[in-house]
Curated annotation (Swiss-Prot):
The keyword Ribonucleoprotein does not apply. Its EC number is 5.3.1.1. Pathway: Carbohydrate biosynthesis; gluconeogenesis; Carbohydrate degradation; glycolysis; D-glyceraldehyde 3-phosphate from glycerone phosphate: step 1/1. GO terms for biological process: gluconeogenesis; glyceraldehyde-3-phosphate biosynthetic process; glycerol catabolic process; glycolytic process. It comes from Magnetococcus marinus (strain ATCC BAA-1437 / JCM 17883 / MC-1). This is Triosephosphate isomerase.
Length: 255
């Protein structure tokens, strides 16, 4: 049985004061509500250490939003997985649609980062998803397949480590556009991803990998989305910046 994961991607938001206040509210809410899921917050790099000071030992895990391929060296502006581990991170988001579209990250670069995350002892949250143009051209499954197949060959050979992979499906066309992906569309994409994982890695791995929904999950749609057979949690953006909304999404797992 896959344990749900509710992950908050704080993106480019939060001074130290604001981030620690949000982390405190999330930590205290999780302690009070005891949601039936794993909980993760992914702040911006500059506040990782401060947020870790708030959530350490609380059951709320810490993650980063990106990482470098290299471990060290002359790579100005980059942050390595070893550095992320050093401040308490256990997860890292890779291949987010904003990294792909705004910063030109390719499938090959994302694959290199996935390999580096495993090397450095971090659990990768691999983001995949199609644009509006690709969906309207009925290329959704083709895009998902290309993005996944670029990364699966770099996974460790050990099935137990393969099972640790987290995949996040981001229908890019449904993020901040006013368009909404139906639960049926979400489930269809998640089922396709799991089927591809089964084909490439085997059923045991596919059945264990958690697939998160990253298409503007909010308190008012979380319960229905989280009720789908292949939706194992959410990668939450805007709603993660308000503790009450973030905690309310977790209620969708038990309500």
């Amino acid at each position: 049985m896959r344990r749900a994961l509710i992950a908050g991607n704080w993106k480019l938001n939060g001074t130290t004061q604001a981030a620690t206040a949000l982390a405190t509210a999330v930590r205290d809410g999780v302690a009070a509500n005891k949601p039936d899921c794993d909980v993760l917050v992914c702040p911006t790099f500059t506040v990782l250490s401060a947020v870790q000071g708030v959530v350490a030992g609380s059951g709320v895990d810490l993650g980063a939003q990106n990482m470098a391929v290299a471990s060290s060296g002359a790579f100005t502006g980059e942050i390595s997985g070893e550095m992320l581990k050093d401040v308490g991170c256990s997860y890292v988001i890779l291949g987010h649609s904003e990294r792909r579209t705004l910063f030109g990250e390719t499938n090959e670069q994302v694959a290199q980062k996935v390999a580096s995350a495993y090397r450095d002892g971090l659990t990768p949250i691999l983001c995949v998803g199609e644009t509006l143009e690709q969906r309207e051209a009925e290329q959704t499954m083709q895009v998902l397949e290309q993005q996944l197949l670029a990364c699966l060959p770099v996974l460790p050979a050990d099935a137990a480590k393969q099972q640790q992979l987290v995949v996040a499906y981001e229908p890019v066309w449904a993020i901040g556009t006013g368009k909404v992906a139906s639960t049926a569309q979400a489930q269809e994409a998640h089922a396709f991803i799991r089927g591809l994982l089964a084909k490439e890695l085997g059923a045991n791995v596919a059945d264990a990998v958690r697939i998160l929904y990253g298409g503007s999950m909010k308190p008012d749609n979380a319960k229905e989305l989280l009720g789908q057979a292949d939706v194992d949690g959410g990668l939450i953006g805007g709603a993660a910046l308000k503790a009450n909304d973030f905690l309310a999404i977790m209620d969708g797992l038990t309500a």
